[in-house]
């Protein structure tokens, strides 16, 4: 699979949110079995939903974190903690999102989420997160 086989708008948004390194790894690992799924998520999740004008990316990241904490999907949560930093959320805001979600998703889900967030934040030196220099309003244009 190559970039040219994926939805261009979805691929652009996916790269902006997750970073080139992550997206390149995902594309490189694509097999004939997973190719339809890569096409689907790039078109539907990134090209349609994440590109909509109704919410900025910072808000979408907050919602995504809460959903992933609830679902207890640690691999996806790790990826989206990084995306949340890239989209301008602070470590303190990420902590508050997990704490707030604990009320509705349960303490075990939040406990696992805090462990994932702590690991990601320890891997990211302070001030080097993409959003550290000031979050840019990245609302998608129509």
Question: What do the PLM-derived regions correspond to, one by one?
Answer:
Residues 76, 107-108:
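Substrate/cofactor-recognition hotspot
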Residues 41-45, 62-69, 97-102, 113:
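Short alpha-helical scaffolding segments that buttress acidic/His motifs in well-ordered protein cores
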Residues 33, 69, 87, 100-107:
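A short structural micro-motif
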Residues 62-65, 69-95:
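Mid-chain, well-packed structural core segment of small domains
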